[in-house]
Amino acid sequence: MASSDIQVKELEKRASGQAFELILSPRSKESVPEFPLSPPKKKDLSLEEIQKKLEAAEERRKSHEAEVLKQLAEKREHEKEVLQKAIEENNNFSKMAEEKLTHKMEANKENREAQMAAKLERLREKDKHIEEVRKNKESKDPADETEAD
């Protein structure tokens, strides 16, 4: 388009900016369009070029498939590692809980045995004291009977 095809008409002028209108003149029939209306024709490809493009596409597909398989293998390996770690942590927790419970049970058993031994000792002491009191009473009783006569 030439500059004579365009007319500029000023609408407003303000401090914040300027507004204008562009008026395009109608196109003349003689003018040739600046761009082609249809896309450019592609040259005919030879059989070798088509074959090369197909081979390149096949290589891209294979490369993409290999990359996807590699990512899947890495993901599976990571999942196995995470699962193994979880199993190991669970086993460690179970062992620690079992050891703690065993230790607690042993401490309770020892405490119970100590309490039983202390009770038995107190009972023996009471029996001994009762026996002493009985002997003392028996030894005093015959003397009291002879004195009473």
Curated annotation (Swiss-Prot):
Ranges annotated as biased composition (Basic and acidic residues): 121-143
Signal peptide positions (record): none
Coiled coil location: 41-140
Cellular localisation: Cytoplasm, Cytoskeleton
Source organism of the structure: Homo sapiens
Tissues and organs where the protein is expressed, per its UniProt entry: Ubiquitous. Expression is strongest in fetal and adult brain, spinal cord, and cerebellum, followed by thymus, bone marrow, testis, and fetal liver. Expression is intermediate in colon, ovary, placenta, uterus, and trachea, and is readily detected at substantially lower levels in all other tissues examined. Lowest expression is found in adult liver.
Subunit structure: Binds to two alpha/beta-tubulin heterodimers. Interacts with KIST.
Modification N6-methyllysine, positions: 29
Keyword Mitochondrion annotated: no
An MF annotation (GO) of this entry: tubulin binding
Chain ranges of the SLD domain: 4-145
Positions carrying N-acetylalanine: 2
Region Disordered, annotated ranges: 121-149
Protein's name according to its UniProt entry: Stathmin
Keywords, sorted A to Z: Acetylation, Coiled coil, Cytoplasm, Cytoskeleton, Developmental protein, Differentiation, Methylation, Microtubule, Neurogenesis, Phosphoprotein
SUPFAM superfamilies per the UniProt record, alphabetical: Stathmin
Pfam families (UniProt xref): Stathmin
Gene3D superfamilies assigned to the protein according to its UniProt record, in alphabetical order: 6.10.280.30
Gene: STMN1
Gene Ontology terms: biological process: axonogenesis; establishment of skin barrier; hepatocyte growth factor receptor signaling pathway; intracellular signal transduction; microtubule depolymerization; mitotic cytokinesis; mitotic spindle organization; negative regulation of guanyl-nucleotide exchange factor activity
Family from the record: Belongs to the stathmin family.
Phosphoserine PTM positions: 4, 16, 25, 31, 38, 63
Induction details: Down-regulated in response to enterovirus 71 (EV71) infection (at protein level).
Residues recorded as bearing N6-acetyllysine in the entry: 9, 100, 119
